Structures are given as structure tokens and as C-alpha cells.
Amino acid sequence: MLCLRGEWTRMKVVKAEFITSAVESHQYPADHLPYVALVGKSNVGKSSMINTVTNRSKLAKTSGQPGKTRLVNFYRINDAFYLVDLPGYGFARVPQKERERWGHMIETFLSSSPNLLGIIQLIDIRHNPTEDDMTMLNWISHYEMPLIILATKADKLGKTRIKPQVDKIRRKLAVSMDMPIIPFSSQTGQGKENLLIALDSLLKNPLGFQG
């Protein structure tokens, strides 16, 4: 698992571009660059996170309405890797057939992408992890996939509430103290530095993420 102690470097994003949207694996980019996937429930802030770390306010389309990401979206960063925004899970207002289609897209990507280097799981810091969050974490653990956990919307909590809530999320997820949970805010930039450090470490040494 990632450890932010000791020597570290921070990734500098100098180029970021949207490349394509896909449903099936044959539509994924063919340049064999590594993927870092973003997973989380609908409206957890995946698109906002992309815009924050790339310093591009409109690179990924954001919406206050859950369920707007309906395809697998590929963003190429520094011509070195892709951030891949997957459809959000757990949005009840979407018809069952549409949810099943999203589920198929997510499962296809996660199970059949040899370029998948790691996963960023986003969880709303204001709430306990959902059953869908737990299911996703179990999948990630089963496949021993390198993981970064972001606790989003940290600006919605007072500073004194952030650490207790992160500790509560850690207990609910049953992850070790060696797995950092990064409080993150797209509004204030909190956690951006640590996320860029984590991404840099993951890309340079993915096996070093394995606990």
C-alpha cells in the first residue's frame, strides 16, 4: 500500500486532454499507456477531481445531477497515462436496465483491461461508505489492485471533523493504517498535493502499492 512518509515527489501535470468515450473494450485507446481508473458512487466528485488535478476547470463535464457519466471516459495526462472516469454506481433513479448497462461497462473495464495500473476510489467524506462502496472495495482487494482512497467534499466539513470522519470511514472499510485515506476538496484544493504524490508513486512503482 502507498505510504506518504519518507522520500517522495509530486507529479506535475503539464498536459491533459480528453481522448474518447467508450462502451466496449475495442473502443478503448490503442496506444497501450497505463490506466488509473476512478470509481465511486454517482455525484461523488470524479469529474471535479479530474479538473482539479489537471488545473483545467472544464476538461471533464461536471453536473449536480447524479448519473451524468454514462460512458467510460479517457483523459490522457502528460502523454504518459490515462485517468479513466467510470460511470458512477448506486444511483437509484436510473432505470434498472440502464444501471445494468453501466454495471456491465464497469465490470468489462475492470476485468479486461491489461493496462489497468491502479484504482482511485472516491467516497463522500460526509457519509459512511455504502454497500456499493464495500462491494467495489472487495473487488479491488480480491484482484490485489493498487488503490488510492479519496474522501471527497472535505470542504463541507469543519476542520475538526475531518480526521474523526476519516477514521470512521477507515473502520467501516476495514482498511489498515498503511492505506492512506486522503481528504480531498475540489473547491479548496485540499488533498491535491497528496493525490499527485500518490499518483507519481503509483506510476513509478505500482508493485510498491501492494500491501
Which residue stretches match the model-derived regions?
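Conserved G1/Walker A P-loop phosphate-binding module
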Residues: 2-93, 209
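Canonical P-loop GTPase G-domain recognition
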Residues: 13-25, 157-211
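Anionic group-transfer/hydrolysis microenvironments
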Residues: 53, 78, 87, 123-126, ...
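Conserved alpha-helical scaffold flanking the Walker A/P-loop in AAA+ ATPase domains
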Residues: 71-77, 104-112
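Residue-level signal for inorganic ion chemistry
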Residues: 75, 152, 195
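Flexible beta-alpha connector loops of hexameric P-loop NTPases
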Residues: 89-99, 155-158
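Glycine- and Gly-Pro-enriched alpha-helical subdomains that act as flexible
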Residues: 98-101, 124-125
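Conserved C-terminal guanine-recognition region of P-loop GTPase G domains, centered on the G4
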Residues: 107-179
